UniProtKB/Swiss-Prot annotation:
One of its GO terms (cellular component) is cytosolic large ribosomal subunit. GO terms for molecular function: 5S rRNA binding; structural constituent of ribosome. Belongs to the universal ribosomal protein uL18 family. It comes from Cupriavidus metallidurans (strain ATCC 43123 / DSM 2839 / NBRC 102507 / CH34) (Ralstonia metallidurans). This is one of the proteins that bind and probably mediate the attachment of the 5S RNA into the large ribosomal subunit, where it forms part of the central protuberance. This is Large ribosomal subunit protein uL18. PANTHER family: 39S RIBOSOMAL PROTEIN L18, MITOCHONDRIAL (PTHR12899), LARGE RIBOSOMAL SUBUNIT PROTEIN UL18M (PTHR12899:SF3). GO terms for biological process: translation. The keyword Ribonucleoprotein applies. Part of the 50S ribosomal subunit; part of the 5S rRNA/L5/L18/L25 subcomplex. Contacts the 5S and 23S rRNAs.
Amino acid sequence: MMNKKDARLRRARQTRAKIAELKVNRLTVFRTNSHIYAQVYSPCGTQVLASASTAEAEVRKELNGNGATVAAATVVGKRVAEKAKAAGVETVAFDRAGFRFHGRVKALADAAREAGLKF
């Protein structure tokens, strides 16, 4: 019988396999109880082109404490989009890593779209 974590990892594996076939840059989101992380990977999946998280000092200055909020995810989404555009990345595939597209994950994706990333 599968637990919640195994089910999430199975969904993530399926998504990553489909994105790998497309050979495009991938925006990956990882969510914990206290932080949210976002990274843009190259099409081969071995090189990180841009990253942002609520664990960064610059992001923490913008937040009023907790890094596990929708507002924090919005800041991270905007920041990772700016860094990706600076690295020359305009279009990505969104990898939600098996997490539901709701709440913090959705806020990060919406902020990245508003900042100019296309997916």
